[in-house]
């Protein structure tokens, strides 16, 4: 599917989609327990992959209107009867590979071509340290993966600068081992707010986990030396239900659209405070000069169009915001410098290179370095760009189309179903001229 975006103004009120990060963790947490009702989850390609994994390990999932009813495997996952296909979901693979280390037999996990190119070696090594069998079939640290146990817990050392999802998977599995897991970080943790999301979900399901060290910032996991989770714990949310909050990663495109092209104002509802690092999009827009207000009590963010100026911003903890910031920089005055972004190259695609390439196709000058992307603002041309089979690339380029000087066509735009299936419909509701099809 291609998407054709006509330069447009936007106006209106929309609701933030449910958080993909929280939904993944809630589905798996319910799987580790007796089960739970996950209320207001994100139903998307990625989260369905996690639901399939829970089913493969012996649980069940069933959609009931806007909720997901999960019956769990009560801390004892069964050996899957078939290969677990994680599709394009790196979160599913990393979280449920650790689950595989708890089975008596072996679990095999694979995914699409993009996922089979992403690094899993540090997680496999960590599971090996715990006594699991954990292998890449191609012996290159990439899927397909073979993993089995069953582990009792123990101590391990792992890098913190490749993916925080390794830590999440280990903590979630460690809570149902016999002796728990002690995690030592051998490098500084990147994407620390995502581990905070994990800690929040664990606590909501009655599971205690501890941060070792830390720098006493609002982000509990920032500067951590490691983590500890005791074994023998049970997953059980209060009243058997868990409510998924709104997704600030997805909100970033709506807020950017309002800052660049609001005729009057754009209001995003469902923006309640949580552990999500991507809530930083609000302060980033403020630093660029946006007219934006966040009523945290009501969970509503209001943004109006204004002239933006370039900024320097690090994305060590907010890698998913890089595409949005790059587009904002292209439309702003001056230079926008995005730093601490080497790990953003390890997502569904190399997002640093992809954004540099596609913005240049739209007439925007960029400089790309190993750990930095510089975008020179001043205007965006119309043209045809590639979506790189990456939902965040597609959605950010759609925002660019609002203020381009001609139509922007995004090839292979259907990957929005990974995190924001109704994205183009939501843009249309705000007044965007958008057509999708061949």
UniProtKB/Swiss-Prot annotation:
Classification via InterPro entries: Enolpyruvate_Tfrase_dom, Enolpyruvate_Tfrase_sf, EPSP_synthase, EPSP_synthase_CS, RNA3'P_cycl/enolpyr_Trfase_a/b
Q: Where in the cell is it found?
A: Cytoplasm
Q: In which pathway does it act?
A: Metabolic intermediate biosynthesis; chorismate biosynthesis
Q: Can you name a GO cellular component term?
A: cytoplasm
Q: Which residues take part in binding 3-phosphoshikimate?
A: 20-21, 25, 163-165, 191, 320, 347
Where are the catalytic residues? Answer: 320
**Claim: Cell membrane is one of the keywords in the record:** no
Q: Which UniProt keywords apply?
A: Amino-acid biosynthesis, Aromatic amino acid biosynthesis, Cytoplasm, Transferase
EC number(s) on file? 2.5.1.19
Q: Name one GO biological process term.
A: amino acid biosynthetic process
Q: What is its main location?
A: cytoplasm
Residues that span the membrane, as ranges: none
Q: What do we know about how this protein assembles, alone or with others? A: Monomer.
NCBIfam families xref list: aroA
Question: What's this protein's name?
Answer: 3-phosphoshikimate 1-carboxyvinyltransferase
Gene from which this protein is expressed: aroA
